[in-house]
Amino acid sequence: MDEIAFGLEMADHPFIWVVRSKTWAPPDGWTKRVKEEGLVVYDWVEQRSILAHPSIGGFLSHCGWNSVMESLANGVPLLTWPMLDISEQALNAKLVTMGLGAGIVVPQRDVGGEKITTIDRGVICERMKELMGGAKGRKVKERAQELGRLAWHAVEKGGSRKKLDELIERLTNKNM
């Protein structure tokens, strides 16, 4: 957690960090140093509301399905960092980055192919800066925004939502 904290500080970009750990405490002086650019929340938050806010420019995610869907539906690109190789997280991360082009990978393996168990602050800083201002970041942001527009269009009147409403109407009338 300290490495994430230092990486966020080094990136020198505004952030909201939701910390669910009951035992982690920020490094000495860190909170004071980032108070102008960072907000740390030590409690549950409604992720959808945060991702829907227009000032959110990216989302560092473990790539659980709900997190991916909420982020992309709101047009927010992802820094993908799956925690578990044996879950859907790794597959979702590949879908977001390689399939959809709406995210940037936080490396999971070192040069020798070994699983990275502790992330380095420099990696967090570098990937955050790339997402928020680099050429690749601009590209994945455009793609995420396009996917967000498509998602909202699908549920607008006349989109896929209309067909779903018609199906529900038919099923409801048939059962009455």
Regions found by a protein language model. Give the residues of each.
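Catalytic core of nucleotide-sugar-dependent glycosyltransferases
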Residues: 1-176
